[in-house]
């Protein structure tokens, strides 16, 4: 599935960043309280596939295992030209963070109701990075409220632009 299927826009972010995919679903399903940047341990065919935008973050999350953090359920599609040197699309991928930062993140994840979800995947100066958000699940009422707010804002913007004409 391409980056568009992952709910994200491809293009340039901040200086030196090339956005591969964004997880728009995460911002709808969860309340994001904090975010961190982490590097990814990838194989060559995974990097090539990412550069083509062949990634899906919609069901992905990060999970601590021992003293390490892993990205689980992130689908990086197979790179066609890799043939038998390819990779497994749904394998768990190790995340790279500084030790104090990793300990802080693990402490927050262990609190009840929190999870770590990828918000966007991008290349920064040639290195694959993922922005992780500390997320707390939203209730259905909160989701409906967010939709109502968004619709109200759209209507106000439409009315303002209509009056300017």
Swiss-Prot record:
It comes from the Bacteria. GO terms for biological process: trans-translation. GO terms for cellular component: cytosol. One of its GO terms (molecular function) is RNA binding. Residues 141-165 are annotated as: Disordered. It is found in: Cytoplasm. Keywords: Cytoplasm, RNA-binding. InterPro entries: SmpB, SsrA-bd_prot, SsrA-bd_prot_CS. SUPFAM superfamilies: Small protein B (SmpB) (SSF74982). CDD domains: SmpB (cd09294). Belongs to the SmpB family. Required for rescue of stalled ribosomes mediated by trans-translation. Binds to transfer-messenger RNA (tmRNA), required for stable association of tmRNA with ribosomes. tmRNA and SmpB together mimic tRNA shape, replacing the anticodon stem-loop with SmpB. tmRNA is encoded by the ssrA gene; the 2 termini fold to resemble tRNA(Ala) and it encodes a 'tag peptide', a short internal open reading frame. During trans-translation Ala-aminoacylated tmRNA acts like a tRNA, entering the A-site of stalled ribosomes, displacing the stalled mRNA. This is SsrA-binding protein. The lineage of its organism: Bacteria, Pseudomonadati, Myxococcota, Myxococcia, Myxococcales.
């Amino acid at each position: 599935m391409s980056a568009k299927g992952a709910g994200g826009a491809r293009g340039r972010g901040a200086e030196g960043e090339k956005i591969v995919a964004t997880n728009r679903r995460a911002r709808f399903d969860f309340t994001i309280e904090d975010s961190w940047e982490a590097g990814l341990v990838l194989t060559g065919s995974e990097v090539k596939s990412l550069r083509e935008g062949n990634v899906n973050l919609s069901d992905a999350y990060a999970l601590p295992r021992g003293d390490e953090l892993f990205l689980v359920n992130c689908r990086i599609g197979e790179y066609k030209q890799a043939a038998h040197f390819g990779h497994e699309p749904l394998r768990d991928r190790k995340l790279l963070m500084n030790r104090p930062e990793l300990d802080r993140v693990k402490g927050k994840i262990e609190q009840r109701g929190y999870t770590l979800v990828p918000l966007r995947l991008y290349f920064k100066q040639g290195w694959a990075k993922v922005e992780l958000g500390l997320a707390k699940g939203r209730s259905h009422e909160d989701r409906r409220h967010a939709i109502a707010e968004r619709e109200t804002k759209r209507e106000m913007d439409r009315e303002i632009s209509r009056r300017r004409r």
